[in-house]
Amino acid sequence: MSIADLKSRLIKASTS
């Protein structure tokens, strides 16, 4: 897991 991956997940969950 990398910072970019976590950021992507957070954005996806935020926009969900």
From Swiss-Prot:
Covalent S-S links between cysteines: none
Sorted UniProt keywords: ATP-binding, DNA damage, DNA recombination, DNA repair, DNA replication, Nucleotide-binding
One annotated GO molecular function: ATP binding
GO biological process, one term: DNA replication
Family: Belongs to the RecA family.
Function according to Swiss-Prot or TrEMBL: Important in genetic recombination, DNA repair, and replication. Possesses pairing and strand-transfer activity. Interacts with dda and gene 32 proteins.
UniProt protein name: Recombination and repair protein
